[in-house]
From Swiss-Prot:
Catalytic activity: 7-aminomethyl-7-carbaguanosine(34) in tRNA + S-adenosyl-L-methionine = epoxyqueuosine(34) in tRNA + adenine + L-methionine + 2 H(+)
GO MF annotations in UniProt: S-adenosylmethionine:tRNA ribosyltransferase-isomerase activity
Principal cellular location given in the protein's record: cytoplasm
InterPro entries: QueA, QueA_dom1, QueA_dom2, QueA_sf
Annotated organism of origin: Polynucleobacter asymbioticus (strain DSM 18221 / CIP 109841 / QLW-P1DMWA-1)
Family classification: Belongs to the QueA family.
Protein's recorded name: S-adenosylmethionine:tRNA ribosyltransferase-isomerase
Keywords from the UniProt entry: Cytoplasm, Queuosine biosynthesis, S-adenosyl-L-methionine, Transferase
């Protein structure tokens, strides 16, 4: 398939700029495929996850935590520069995206500052053709806490505020390292998590630190030429055991978000419970672990739109997205959600 197969026109007013008052207030579009692989679309509220997830199923969340990954500074020449952490590669090292009129050269220094007037300097030490490696003078995390800003997605037009600091994190977030939130998890609050437990829906976690590359557009019309970005993941032994037990007992594995799905499928492919993954899922991929997927609506021509198309069928996703546009669903990180099941895993 070609990149143009995953394009669609989205009215800009449907891009959610702020979260709703309550996490569980969002809408939920259920996409059911029949034996002819046609999509049956059911408009629901997110709280209907209590119906869609059934006793014996296993919800798998990504427990990564968004870090204040955006830094502002000046080059040695005095020009402004913005650094966005892509992924942390060591105690004092990170790969970054750089925005500047002219990118600083390897070996040069960038001076980072904050609103309190404090400064520190990072050294440019490498370039891999896409991202720049920088060396920090101290622990990356501690410096980000003092100097960094929350990295909202590029389509959110306001500067991050106190509301974003709370709502652009999931309630299960505990392992710092992500540059973007695993947005399907944003719809859950503590109350609905407990209600799911009460009705016999089990829960487990993985960690996948979402990188800034998740927002990088695919530029190759031939998808086989696209270079997928790397992200670090880890799956606890307890989660692997819960998956095995669930499948043995006839339950379904429900990935909460594409990042949870990619972590689970990466482990199944590599048989490694942690490491870096650049798994690029397109139509034709044979899913090994995940039966159902809870996910938000994704950007045109994005790798995530390709993933959900692989999962539920290209035509089904096209129909679902057009329906969502017609029905004024809210799109992207702060938007509404979809519930998808693979054809052979639909329960009546």
């Amino acid at each position: 398939m070609q990149l143009s197969d995953f394009n669609y026109e989205l009215p800009p007013e449907l891009i959610a700029q702020h979260p709703l008052a309550n996490r569980t207030d969002s809408r939920l579009l259920e996409v059911r495929a029949d034996g002819m692989n046609h999509a049956h679309l059911v408009d629901r509220q997110f709280k209907d996850i209590l119906i869609l997830a059934q006793p014996g199923d296993l919800l798998v969340f990504n427990d990564t935590k968004v870090i204040p990954a955006r830094l502002h500074g000046k080059k040695e020449t005095g020009g402004n520069v913005e650094l966005l952490i892509e992924r942390i590669s060591g105690e004092k090292q990170a790969w970054v995206q750089i925005r500047a009129s002219k990118v600083p050269k390897t070996g040069s220094t960038v001076h980072i500052y904050n609103q309190s007037g404090e400064t520190f300097s990072v050294e440019m030490i490498g370039y891999d053709g896409r991202f720049y490696e920088v060396l920090f003078p101290d622990h990356v995390f501690s410096l980000l806490e003092r100097f960094g800003k929350l990295p909202l997605p590029p389509y959110i037009e306001h500067q991050p505020d106190g509301e974003d600091a709370q709502r652009y994190q999931t309630v299960v977030a505990k392992n710092p390292g992500a540059v973007a939130a695993p947005t399907a998890g944003l719809h859950f609050d503590e109350v609905i998590l407990q209600k799911l437990k009460d009705v016999g829906v089990n829960q487990a976690t993985v960690t996948l630190h979402v990188g800034a590359g998740t927002f990088t557009p695919v530029r190759e019309e031939d998808l086989s030429k696209h270079q997928m970005h790397y992200e670090w993941f880890s799956i606890p032994k307890e989660t692997l055991q819960a998956i095995e037990k669930t499948k043995k007992n006839g339950g379904r594995i429900i990935a909460v978000g594409t990042t949870s799905l990619r972590a689970l499928e990466s482990q199944a492919n590599s048989q490694q419970s942690s490491g870096e993954t650049n798994l690029f899922i397109t139509p034709g991929y044979q899913f090994k672990v995940v039966d159902c997927l809870l996910t938000n609506f994704h950007l045109p021509k994005s790798t995530l739109l390709m993933l959900v198309s692989a999962f539920a069928g290209v035509d089904n996703i096209r129909s679902a997205y057009q329906h969502a546009i017609n029905q004024q669903y809210r799109f992207f990180s702060y938007g509404d959600a979809m519930f998808l099941c693979r054809l052979e895993n639909i329960k009546p």
